[in-house]
Regions:
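Conserved Class I S-adenosyl-L-methionine-dependent methyltransferase catalytic core
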Residues: 1-129
Length: 129
């Protein structure tokens, strides 16, 4: 779960949006074109993980952890590691152990015909939307 939370935060570019001045969930929702109440709950999950802090006015501030998600190169890694081609095979681990067939190939086909195009897609999508 935490990996997906970090992935979404990186994909939305939240750490870059909470710059020198703290932002409210509403301000961040407008900047990211996301659903305000959902983003507010999501930001509180990030607070729970120590990635941001929230003050009494509902503004979100950086922590040392959130600073690592600002721009490149760490944000790109967080986006890549949260991508479906990384996490989906773990859901098939049991089948892989039982059958001996690699989970990645079961889901996506050949690693060589799948991984390189997806790597390019992720590189392009690491820029906040």
């Amino acid at each position: 779960m935490a990996a997906q939370v970090v992935y979404v935060a990186a994909k939305l570019g939240l750490a870059d949006l909470v710059t020198q001045e703290p932002k409210t969930a509403r301000e961040l929702a407008q900047a990211t074109k996301t659903h305000g109440p959902s983003l507010g709950r999501f930001l509180r999950a990030l607070v729970g993980l120590g990635i941001f802090t929230e003050d009494e006015k509902g503004r979100f501030h950086h922590t040392p952890l959130s600073e690592t998600l600002r721009s490149e190169p760490v944000r790109a890694w967080a986006v890549m590691l949260g991508a479906p081609f990384i996490w989906r095979p773990w859901g098939e681990l049991y089948e892989a152990v039982v059958t001996g067939r690699p989970a990645f190939e079961r889901i996506f086909g050949s690693i060589y015909s799948t991984i390189w195009p997806r790597t390019q897609m992720i590189a392009r999508s690491s820029t906040p939307q």
